[in-house]
């Protein structure tokens, strides 16, 4: 199946939602579905579903809809969920510790296999309840190379984010999910995604305010 490589960011961010919905439909023994049903399950409009899917060629057939099993397999391959992806975590502060206890593998094929923090951190040398080892930052290059890890989660203070990100790239990391509220300057081949909790909360509050305005206008 051929499809456009440069899909919009908004569409890319919905891919995991589509995959989750098709897995749910499959568990519920639903054989085929429609853009309307998909849209209702996600909370968007059917036109958005059809537009998103159009970037990937003919995913459905007019008059039939979408084959659930076929689309579940398609999105699994698209999101590389047919093979286990090893992930390293750098920074075991509040966010990092929470992520260490998040059971990634129960929901998909991602596996958090190791964590790092400053060499003098009291947690260095220990393991989590799930047997995830915590190493000192000085071991980052050797340990990541041993496990051939290409993906990392970065949850360090902003002032250290650039320095640590460069260490990760030198160690062979090709994709970073960054929780630090700072723009990283890294080689073009490194894929970056940012999670800004403050920004997300502000966006939530904005939509709550707009919803309140709409209710008042309808009263």
From Swiss-Prot:
Q: What is this protein called?
A: Redox-sensing transcriptional repressor Rex
One record GO biological process: response to redox state
State the similarity comment. Belongs to the transcriptional regulatory Rex family.
Which function does this protein serve?
Modulates transcription in response to changes in cellular NADH/NAD(+) redox state.
Locate the residues binding NAD(+). Answer: 91-96
Q: Say if the entry is tagged with keyword DNA-binding.
A: yes
Organism in which the protein naturally occurs: Streptococcus thermophilus (strain ATCC BAA-491 / LMD-9)
- DNA-binding positions are 17-56
Q: Which InterPro entries match?
A: CoA-bd, NAD(P)-bd_dom_sf, Rex_DNA-bd_C_dom, Tscrpt_rep_Rex, WH-like_DNA-bd_sf, WH_DNA-bd_sf
- Record's superkingdom? Bacteria
Question: What HAMAP family does UniProt report for this protein, alphabetically?
Answer: Rex
Q: Name one GO cellular component term.
A: cytoplasm
The record's GO molecular-function terms, alphabetically, read:
DNA binding; DNA-binding transcription factor activity
Outline the subunit composition. Homodimer.
The cellular location(s) given in this protein's UniProt record come to: Cytoplasm
Q: Which gene holds the coding sequence for this protein?
A: rex
Q: Which SMART domains match?
A: CoA_binding
- Keyword Transport among record annotations: no
Keywords, sorted A to Z: Cytoplasm, DNA-binding, NAD, Repressor, Transcription, Transcription regulation
